[in-house]
Each structure stands twice: as structure tokens, then as C-alpha cells.
Amino acid sequence: MRVPGAVPACLLAVGVLLTGACAEGGDDGTLRVSGSTTVNPVAADAATALRDRQGMAITVDTQGGSAGGLAQLCSGEIDIAMSSKPVADSDRLRFPGCDYTPTRIGEDAVGVIVRREVYDGGVRSLRPDQVRGIVEARITNWSAVGGPDLDIFVYDKEPGRGTREVLDTYLYGDEAAPPPPDSDRFAIVGGNEETRTKLLSTPGAVGPLSTSFIEGYPGLAAVSLEGVEATPETIASGDYPMSRPLFLVTDGPARGAAKTFLDYVVSDAGQRLVARHGYLTLAQLAG
């Protein structure tokens, strides 16, 4: 899809800085995008492309993950929220006046990611009850689930992160997840990059993470869930139990620069960015 013509000039200096001609957005003409660290690589590349093509001024940030982005959207701080989860009832209750309008841009999988020595030591697949036991610190050594004699260290995502919500739904359904365990081998982390760094540096570590974020990192592996591996086919079919859609969300129908941005991401050029970062495209989901 060809993006519309150029817009007036302005200045910008925060976040992922893309300066040039101004798009409809904030008071200074800047289009502001924030939220999910999973969606961020696609949005950042799309912002760069639109800067190069028509000089739009755009910031892309990741404050607070998916829930943080949705809150900023409804507070009028940003124009587009990146979300790696559907808009939840809790989001609507928090901001009842917000007209959440999601645009799906692709599909991702959340994996239960372990260190390579755990995977090679025999932990290739886990059941939901085993994952629950691990994250609740009732299972504390990998030998209890067929792995090496190695203590488990859990890195869980902070509340409000899309990845955390996908894991909680898989493990607990509609029930509330229990509070974090009182354990010195459990820690809360934020974005995907931080999670990956912690997993790589901690023996016996495990945590939920987008499977695309471990591509090119041989020190990490995604275990199968109930015997189902996360592949393009199982993600598209929904057979993999922690598949999730990726969204760009606006407050009401997108207009002006926000519409230009959304149109680009769902265009052929934008979908190539989705594929580049390891996510399934809309065409792949359509079969």
C-alpha cells in the first residue's frame, strides 16, 4: 500500500527520534507510539520507513508494556498503543470513556523459555500443571520434571505485560493468578530484552518470553507445551496454546498520521517487517 503525500515540517527530540516533516499527532505535530516491547521492533522499523519516505516525525517508546501503552493512549499522552494482548475488560473498566480500536498486525507465540543446559538435560516438553508448579515455586529443581539436578530460577513478567497475561490465561484461565511466591529464586522483570538477558545469565533459569526474541540465541530454547512445539503452522492454527495476536490500538478510528502509520504496517511493505522480526503475517494467518 502506498503511503499518502508529505505533511508540514516540525521538530522532535525524544524516544526513537525521527525528525522531518510533521504528522498530525501531538501539539508539536509528532505522532507518538508506545507500549509493548514485543510489537516495538515492527513499529520502530515502520517509523524509520515513514521518516525516510515522507519525513514524518514519530516517537516509539515502550513505557509500561501493553497495559502501559493502553493507559497512555486513553490518557491522551500518545496516539497509538502497541499491544501484545487483546484489550481486556480490566482495560475498559479502567478507562470507560476510551474507544479502543485495535488493528491486528500479526501473530506471535509466548514460549516457556529455558536455558540450553535445561533443554539438553531432558526438559523438552511441559504440562500446564508442571509450569504452574514451577512459577509458584512448588517445583524447585529441574530433576522433578525430567531434567538435570539443577535449581530452578524463575523470571516472571510484571503485571500488565501482554506476555504475563498470556501465561496467566494459559495456566489459570479466568481465575486470578496467585501472588508471587516468597522465594529467593524468583524475580519480576519488565521488557523482552531484559528477560532475555536475565535468562542468558542465570543458570537454571526459566521465564515467559516471545519465541521470536530467542532467535539467534543458541543459549536459550523454548520447550513444547503439552507436546506441541511453537511453529508457524501450530501458531496459525491455534494448536500451540500460547499463541497471541499483536495489535496497534487507537482511541477511535485512526485519522491523519495515525492512519498513515497503520496503513503502512498492514501493507505489503509493513508486513515484511512483521515477518522480519519472526512474527506471523496477516497473510499467513489467512492461510
Each model region followed by its residue ranges:
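Short acidic (Asp/Glu) patches
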Residues: 94-98
